[in-house]
């Protein structure tokens, strides 16, 4: 169309259409944006704890609770599954397995692991009250949740705590596969999944943390991109054994995968910290390039001259020492008989049996002949007089980026991609006893099991049925002293405890939304206000009571949500006490219940600010302000004293208050802090 063809009336009509489209389109965009912002708010909201329980060895349970344990049939049946207690026989007919269990039986089996979920609230309250330092007494935390929500839940409590980060996320195979998790993400979705969780985990890592991420060839280039986009510093691309070939595939078999090691900028890895076990060292040649004078060395009475242009790598004095230590041997070039320094074969056999892992004889099998001798100057029994010198490497070989000498997977717990404890042991050797380890793609819990055996603190996350079918049984077995994997290399756990929680999920949040229509607030003549409300404020306003409701705090011990169980919505009690502990980042020392369980008192120290904190939860229907004041007097609590830096109480109260040096009030309403922490942006 040319400009001379334009008619003024057409221009005016077309412009009116454009303005109408722009106006309607803008309203549609605003309406959609309202829903997207609301969805984001629901996703980022820190979720409620809907269950918090403890797994504890019996030696940590007060004996006054043993009678109730003996009558608990659910716990007894689990002990049969995990620890085969029905096979335990007593001495002289006393103390063996029976139904019901006896107190004597419990006393004789202190390593049995009790799960508080199988007992009454009263039992659990008494057990927790017996702990002098609740959080410190627990070696780990296991979370049943989608991992993004779990990472948000623990940020305040674990900030700057974790020393080793290890994840083995689902490999993006671009197709469905026989796994218990999804493997057919689009690349963009998989990248987003990985990036979000790595970013969400960052606040809980120490500046000195080591970040390990395992992947295969499908995602190695993506993993490096994501880690470096988050500001982490590349350290190494480690090869780990795959050990699982693809049956029926026309492709060349893939024998390795990648384990990426990153750190925070400016931090290095102590490469001398981790050494290979002597079991990983193989017999090798003892010759090196170049000449040396004199060239010959004597081995077991046999003087050997190296080929021209080569030399033996050590002087005679060190050769003799290595022969004494069985780190040198001779191998007959004809028949392959192996000769070690010893008085006799029998003596050598005893030495091998006694020292066990002191040296590893890789090629001594039933078909291999070996001799313990002092002298082979007359040659081998086969008549040959030529020998090869072999050297067993020193047990302090420092590792490099080739970890193919150990298995990458195992199949002990029926999980197809179960990381081997041997691999996890090497990863965790970069840390110290007592350091904290996290794995939020828990899988079969190999990371956590290994961490527990190596006396590390641990945090693990897994979702769905996997949590109950594999993770919980495995960690209970580890706590009870099971002996698979690396167990024989470390002292058996004498006693212990760990905590596990279940979180409300995003889908649960959606299922609990109640929309309260407010159509009666609009005047018939005020269409502009009504439209603005519908387009921009409706979702937040009409669902407000679903996301946060002051009624929950009247009796916080009776607060419930609808959650999904076995594909059905069921009413589930919310643990408001534990939810708040995580929201404020409270490292709990003690938890005690009073006044017929109508008051719960939590004492601890906030993780970040290190404020000594007292939290008082009450059933306001039973404990009014006068009763609360009497309770404070009874417990000798004072809001004006310096015993605590912060005191939280639910419900309006008449407690005296004090302004702190940082201009904050000492006594704070739980409702106020709860709402702020639950919905605050990062």
Per-segment meaning from a language model:
Residues 1-123, 139, 155-159, 163, ...:
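Accessory, often C-terminal, charged low-complexity segments
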Residues 125-142:
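Conserved P-loop NTPase mechanochemical-coupling segment
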Residues 143, 212-213, 440, 460:
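Conserved SAM-binding loop
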Residues 152:
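Conserved Rossmann-fold cofactor-binding substructure of NAD(P)-dependent oxidoreductases
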Residues 160-176, 227, 437-451, 580:
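Conserved proline-anchored active-site loop of SAM-dependent methyltransferases
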Residues 163, 169-193, 197, 206-208, ...:
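Mobile active-site "lid"/loop adjacent to the S-adenosyl-L-methionine
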Residues 411-423:
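Conserved SAM-binding loop and adjacent beta-strand
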């Amino acid at each position: 169309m040319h400009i001379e063809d334009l008619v003024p009336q057409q221009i005016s009509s077309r412009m009116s259409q454009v303005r109408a489209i722009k106006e309607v389109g803008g309203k549609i965009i605003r309406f959609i944006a309202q829903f997207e912002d609301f969805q984001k708010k629901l996703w980022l909201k820190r979720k409620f704890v809907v269950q918090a329980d403890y797994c504890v060895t019996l030696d940590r349970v007060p004996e006054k609770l043993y009678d109730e344990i003996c009558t608990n049939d659910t716990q007894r049946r689990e002990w049969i599954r995990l620890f085969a207690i029905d096979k335990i026989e007593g001495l002289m007919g006393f103390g063996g397995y029976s139904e019901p269990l006896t107190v004597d039986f419990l006393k004789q089996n202190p390593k049995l692991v009790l799960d508080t979920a199988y007992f009454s609230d009263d039992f659990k309250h008494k057990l927790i009250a017996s702990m002098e330092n609740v959080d410190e007494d627990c070696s780990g935390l296991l979370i049943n949740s989608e991992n993004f929500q779990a990472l948000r839940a623990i940020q305040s409590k674990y900030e700057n705590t974790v020393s080793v980060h290890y994840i083995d996320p689902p490999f993006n195979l671009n197709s469905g596969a026989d796994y218990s998790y999804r493997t057919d993400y689009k690349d963009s979705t998989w990248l987003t999944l990985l990036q979000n969780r790595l970013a969400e985990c960052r606040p809980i890592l120490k500046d000195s943390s080591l970040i390990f991420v395992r992947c295969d060839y499908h995602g190695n280039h993506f993993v490096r991109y994501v880690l470096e986009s988050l500001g982490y510093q590349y350290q190494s691309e480690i090869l780990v054994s795959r050990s699982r070939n693809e049956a029926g595939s026309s492709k060349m078999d893939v024998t390795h995968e990648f384990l990426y090691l990153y750190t925070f900028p400016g931090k290095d890895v102590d490469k001398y910290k981790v050494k290979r076990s002597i079991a990983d060292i193989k017999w090798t040649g003892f010759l090196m390039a170049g000449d040396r004078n004199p060239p010959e060395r004597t081995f077991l009475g046999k003087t050997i001259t190296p080929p021209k242009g080569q030399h033996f790598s050590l002087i005679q004095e060190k050769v003799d020492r290595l022969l004494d230590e069985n780190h040198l041997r001779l191998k007959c070039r004809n028949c392959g008989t192996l000769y070690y320094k010893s008085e006799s074969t029998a003596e050598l056999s005893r030495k091998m049996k006694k020292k066990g892992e002191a040296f590893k004889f890789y090629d001594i099998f039933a078909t291999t002949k070996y001799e313990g001798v002092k002298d082979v100057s007359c040659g081998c029994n086969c008549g040959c007089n030529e020998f090869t010198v072999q050297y067993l490497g020193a047990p302090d070989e420092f590792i490099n980026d080739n970890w193919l000498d150990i298995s990458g997977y195992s199949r002990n717990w029926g999980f197809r991609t179960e990381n081997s404890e041997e691999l996890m042991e090497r990863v965790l050797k970069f840390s110290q006893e007592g350091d904290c380890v996290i794995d939020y793609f828990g899988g079969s819990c190999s990371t956590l099991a290994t961490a527990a055996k190596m006396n590390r603190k641990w945090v693990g996350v897994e979702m769905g049925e996997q949590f109950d079918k594999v993770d919980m049984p495995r960690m209970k077995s580890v706590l009870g002293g099971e002996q698979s994997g690396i167990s024989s290399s470390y002292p058996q756990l004498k006693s212990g405890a760990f905590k596990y929680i279940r979180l409300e999920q995003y889908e649960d949040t959606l299922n609990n939304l109640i929309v309260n229509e407010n159509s009666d607030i609009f005047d018939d003549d005020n269409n502009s206000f009504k439209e603005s409300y519908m387009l921009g404020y409706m979702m937040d306003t009409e669902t407000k009571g679903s996301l946060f409701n002051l009624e929950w705090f009247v009796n916080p011990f009776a607060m419930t949500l609808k959650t999904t169980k076995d594909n059905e919505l069921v009413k589930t009690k919310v643990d408001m006490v534990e939810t708040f502990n995580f929201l404020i980042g409270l490292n709990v020392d003690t938890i005690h219940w009073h006044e017929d369980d109508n008051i719960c008192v939590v004492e601890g120290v906030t993780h970040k600010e290190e404020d000594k904190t007292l939290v008082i939860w009450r059933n306001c229907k039973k404990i009014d302000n006068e009763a609360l004041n009497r309770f404070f007097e009874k417990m000798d609590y004072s809001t004006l004293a310096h015993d605590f830096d912060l005191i939280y109480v639910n419900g309006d109260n008449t407690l005296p208050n004090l302004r702190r040096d940082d201009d904050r009030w000492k006594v704070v309403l739980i409702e106020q802090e709860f709402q702020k922490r639950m919905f605050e942006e990062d």
